[in-house]
């Protein structure tokens, strides 16, 4: 699913012309293309990066192992998950020749929303507190 979503994003940029963002594509922020030139050559051969991001490492570890990711057991589990994601990115890069990157991101703007959705789906996870103000 992640691969399909990332490739959908990548493929949606194919055929886009530099006019879509002159600052980026014509005036040098990314490239100096002619007006109306397609950006495709900057989507291939490692010039661009397709980013897979993850958030909620603590919450995932707490839900799956009932320990923090800072404990030896939790750290081992969290590292296995991250290595799995990294291996997937490496596999996709090898298969496509495109640059894939893995990012762990603090996502404060999503925390409340995702925590609410997780609580609705999985119930209360011990040691993870969510105060809903509705």
Residue ranges and their predicted role:
Residues 1-63:
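Structured mid-domain segments that build the active-site/substrate or prosthetic-cofactor binding neighborhood
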Residues 70-89:
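Short secondary-structure subsegments characteristic of cysteine-rich extracellular domains
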Residues 93-134:
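Extended amphipathic alpha-helical segments with heptad-repeat/coiled-coil character used for oligomerization
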Residues 43, 47, 68-75:
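Short, charged/polar micro-motifs that form catalytic or ligand-binding hotspots
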Residues 58, 66-68, 108-113:
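Flexible loop/turn segments at secondary-structure boundaries
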Residues 8, 84-99:
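A structural motif corresponding to the C-terminal end of an alpha-helix
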Residues 12-26, 72-75, 94-106:
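Short, glycine/acidic-rich hinge or "gate" loops at secondary-structure transitions
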Residues 25-32, 82-88, 108-115:
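Eukaryote-specific, cytoplasm-facing alpha-helical/coiled-coil scaffolding segments in long proteins
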């Amino acid at each position: 699913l992640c691969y399909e979503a990332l490739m959908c994003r990548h493929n949606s940029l194919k055929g886009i012309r530099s006019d879509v963002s002159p600052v980026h594509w014509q005036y040098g922020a990314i490239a100096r293309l002619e007006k109306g030139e397609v950006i495709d050559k900057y989507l291939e051969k490692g010039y661009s990066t397709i980013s897979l991001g993850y958030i909620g490492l603590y919450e995932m570890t707490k839900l799956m192992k009932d320990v923090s990711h800072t404990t030896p057991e939790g750290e081992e589990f969290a590292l296995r998950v991250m290595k799995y994601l990294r291996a997937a990115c490496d596999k996709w890069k090898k298969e496509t020749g495109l640059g894939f990157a893995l990012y762990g991101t603090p996502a404060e703007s999503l925390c409340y929303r995702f925590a609410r959705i997780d609580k609705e789906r999985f119930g209360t996870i011990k040691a993870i507190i969510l105060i809903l103000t509705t």
